[in-house]
Amino acid sequence: MDASTLFKKVKVKRVLGSLEQQIDDITTDSRTAREGSIFVASVGYTVDSHKFCQNVADQGCKLVVVNKEQSLPANVTQVVVPDTLRVASILAHTLYDYPSHQLVTFGVTGTNGKTSIATMIHLIQRKLQKNSAYLGTNGFQINETKTKGANTTPETVSLTKKIKEAVDAGAESMTLEVSSHGLVLGRLRGVEFDVAIFSNLTQDHLDFHGTMEAYGHAKSLLFSQLGEDLSKEKYVVLNNDDSFSEYLRTVTPYEVFSYGIDEEAQFMAKNIQESLQGVSFDFVTPFGTYPVKSPYVGKFNISNIMAAMIAVWSKGTSLETIIKAVENLEPVEGRLEVLDPSLPIDLIIDYAHTADGMNKLIDAVQPFVKQKLIFLVGMAGERDLTKTPEMGRVACRADYVIFTPDNPANDDPKMLTAELAKGATHQNYIEFDDRAEGIKHAIDIAEPGDTVVLASKGREPYQIMPGHIKVPHRDDLIGLEAAYKKFGGGPVD
């Protein structure tokens, strides 16, 4: 596309140079800028990428978007705008032909449950033989092809490119995990949502948002801003078991479908049966009651299942067809995932990293604990520490507790575990400043019949260490290796 045509979509302060050049790429990553690219510089929390403008010029890039004039060669056109990231969003959606308009887009937000609900929607679509894409905490996936991701919600240009990639691959739908950070930072500007789903709201990310009111407002942006294409039918799916849903009803102009277990809703789960092999329940709907079985474990996953089923149903698939698909879904990686059932202990990993998430996790596993419940939990560095003692208190519902850091970054690991220990309600706990050693200790003290839960990370493949360096780390692999060494079995894949 000609740059002069592209920039007709935005208001600029001034242009230094010529816009008569062909553009086939937009990037906010200076390392990928090249001839034919537009490089959009921005002022981030830790890095001002304006300082890389000369680098991109050396790589052949001839057009940059900046918030003030840079010292660059005369053959590099500079477009000066007040808000570079807002302009990046407009340019990306325009250049890539508004990809979110070309498929059904589901957006899932909430403190806990985003990954599970989003993954379930994607897996249901695949069971229905539909081409589908997913983008979130577990990376980027088109059908069964997966790639890793850095953030739950990537920055606006990368996000738009991923949606375009899904469209080009023939995806009929795409499910996005929508983080509060992504909403506040404008990463989702221009994305057209067909269905918005809310799981719950509990304390988290106050290091970023400051207050629960601000955090809640951030989440509400998804429901008030589903997009601008009024020709599409749009729907909102709300969890009536969470009181924040009442507020979300007031901010959305779209039709709402509610689900719940404890509170009255349009769609409800009754006669619930649970085991470590899965759940079953009667799905009570406005159209009748349907028996549902699922391999997912825990009462909280029943809420997630209902949210996913309603979302897919809202776009035209019958409930009977969806329920058949749900019965055969694969587990969501790292979400109440039982590792190697042949072991004499129940070894479980989960992503729970808030007091609410941990409570629900313990509620799910405690009825099936045969001997002791050994619970390992970590606290992340450079995060809201006001929630930490409550996490320690909840962890002490277990018989034995191990406190570790989780992505300590530049914080002192010993400080993080001490903050967790402030909430301890019994003395059966130990602190490790090395998470891997804490996991090995959990296995070392476990006896046949015990349940060992490794919480906070799921299958996250790294630890963020000082200097924000990512060091390879997998809870599941460390736990399995220690368990096989003690009890036999293996090897670790």
Curated annotation (Swiss-Prot):
UDP-N-acetyl-alpha-D-muramoyl-L-alanyl-D-glutamate binds at residues 30, 151-153, 179, 187. GO terms for biological process: cell division; cell wall organization; peptidoglycan biosynthetic process; regulation of cell shape. Optimum pH is 8.4-9. Optimum pH is 8.4-9.2. Carboxylation is probably crucial for Mg(2+) binding and, consequently, for the gamma-phosphate positioning of ATP. Its EC number is 6.3.2.7. Belongs to the MurCDEF family. MurE subfamily. This is UDP-N-acetylmuramoyl-L-alanyl-D-glutamate--L-lysine ligase. The lineage of its organism: Bacteria, Bacillati, Bacillota, Bacilli, Bacillales.
